[in-house]
């Protein structure tokens, strides 16, 4: 859990960062399948000012916390997570799709918005008591985030908080994460999916 004394960026909507960054997220209808409104963060990442602003939001949120690792979910969580880990001067743990890691792994299966999958991490990626921030670009159904959380907990890590750029509240993933005992911080949300 994040310290109640370290919440300088708690209400981003009041500061209008959320609306500004949302303007740099592209919506792609019917991708990867019919009926899905894909939220594409690449325009936000391509602009150095918006990318810096996004990372600074997370840095200011976590810089006063004792964080040992940032764990990023495959694949866009790697982009945000590795930069955040660098800025916080801590290690980075990739949580990958099944079959992508070369060493001994631990695996967790989960349901996606449009199918089933599994994620895994190296068995030596963290140690008991490590304080970890878990990050991805988007929380839809919450399956990927919860799978990452379960992996880290299984390895004995203390997951301080989950973070994402976007939450899709209608799909219930944010609530699933919170109901699962994990605090969730997101920069913006979109109605509809």
From Swiss-Prot:
It comes from the Bacteria. Disulfide bonds: none annotated. Its main location: cytoplasm. One of its GO terms (cellular component) is cytoplasm. SUPFAM superfamilies: PRTase-like (SSF53271). GO terms for biological process: adenine salvage; AMP salvage; purine ribonucleoside salvage. Pathway: Purine metabolism; AMP biosynthesis via salvage pathway; AMP from adenine: step 1/1. One of its GO terms (molecular function) is adenine phosphoribosyltransferase activity. Keywords: Cytoplasm, Glycosyltransferase, Purine salvage, Transferase. The keyword Glycosyltransferase applies. It is found in: Cytoplasm. InterPro entries: Ade_phspho_trans (IPR005764), PRibTrfase_dom (IPR000836), PRTase-like (IPR029057), UPRTase/APRTase (IPR050054). HAMAP family: Aden_phosphoribosyltr. Catalyzes a salvage reaction resulting in the formation of AMP, that is energically less costly than de novo synthesis. Homodimer. NCBIfam families: apt, PRK02304.1-3, PRK02304.1-5. PANTHER family: ADENINE PHOSPHORIBOSYLTRANSFERASE (PTHR32315:SF3). Belongs to the purine/pyrimidine phosphoribosyltransferase family. This is Adenine phosphoribosyltransferase. It comes from Chromobacterium violaceum (strain ATCC 12472 / DSM 30191 / JCM 1249 / CCUG 213 / NBRC 12614 / NCIMB 9131 / NCTC 9757 / MK).
